[in-house]
Amino acid sequence: MVYLPTLLFSLGEGAVVPLIPVIAASRGATLASAGLIASALVVGQLCGNIPAGWLVSRVGERYTMVIAGALSLIGVVAGALAPSLVVFTVAVFVVGMSAAAFGLARHAFMTTRVPVEFRARALSLLGGSFRAGMFVGPFLAAALLALFHTENAALWFFVVLLVALILLVLFGPDPEAQAAAADRDAGDVEDTGEAVSGSIPTIERAGVFRTMWRNRGVLGRLGLAAASLSAVRSARQVVLPLWGVSIGLDASSIALVVGVSGAIDFALFYASGQVMDRFGRLWAALPAMVLMGAGFLVLSLTHDASTNVLWFGMIAAVLGVGNGLSSGILLTLGADVAPQSEPAAFLGSWRTLTDAGGAIAPLLFSGIAAISSLAIGAAAMGAIGIIGAVGFLRFIPRFVPRRTLP
């Protein structure tokens, strides 16, 4: 009941996300406007993380998932039936906010309930469930397009998955209740009949913004390093296709290279968790950042080389390895440094930082490429990767001490 809802949501999201600009353009948007409408999903995720932290702390993970699923359902149906581009944009924004709440609910549950000895493997598997959906979703969308000849088919497919998800969460086994019952059983002690003296401690509910302020040190240091990882990951999705176009490859060749890179990435998601649980978080984060940072730096030097196509393929594979090695690291680090009594508010801030890094990087790369060149833009992404590696090297030992690791 932890991974299946994530897979269902990500399958639907993966089927719809590539088609958002296409649907917008088919309804009269210009190419520039279609890009802005597609960005409403990321903006919704950024805006949704902090409110989601508040919601999880008030109603719990299970009901947050139900609320997020219901809001997504409303958003997707509104998108399918939208009479105007404004309504469609709002619908995309709502789906983004709901995705943030859904993801944070699972993250918070795993943070409090999964033993630290195999936390990284569990969270890497959670991240792998999301990656599986985002990887398979576009292929399902292509099949639906071929079958029904309309982009709305992917939206209605998402609706079906959301209905199944809501029913599963409402009526399936509740891992939250099961874990709480296990905790009560483990905590049972013999009643000696003696009076209890002294005060009984209670958990203070700090609130979202007070939690952010109390944890400003870790958020401003390790959180920014994590945001740089998210930035480099996101840049990969933009740099590789544009680089392929700039060196003269056709669309099918670019798709093949990017697809192979994605397959390598997906194949390594569980290995990342094994490395983190056995050797420590730094042994996954540092190689991943060094590989991706160095990969972008090397790529920036190969644009005009006679073997640029070969270099493009090799660097795409290296970036896939780096991204795969980092699978689950942001979830795991967030869980490691979150207050264990009430992590949701902190995780909302943590995920806002990492999502912001992922949102800013493509804009930064595009801006640098527009005023200079793709090579300089790629080099800038490589520099962010190396700086992030230094940040992890400095701050993971400081904020994730060895006592939290096996």
Roles of regions detected by a PLM:
Residues 48-60, 268-281:
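Helix-to-loop junctions at the C-terminal end of transmembrane segments
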Residues 60, 81-83, 280, 302-306:
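Helix-breaking motifs and short loop linkers at transmembrane-helix boundaries and internal kinks
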Residues 154-170, 378-394:
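Symmetry-related core transmembrane helices of the 12-TM Major Facilitator Superfamily/SLC fold
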Residues 176-222:
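Juxtamembrane intracellular "pre-TM" segments in multi-pass secondary transporters
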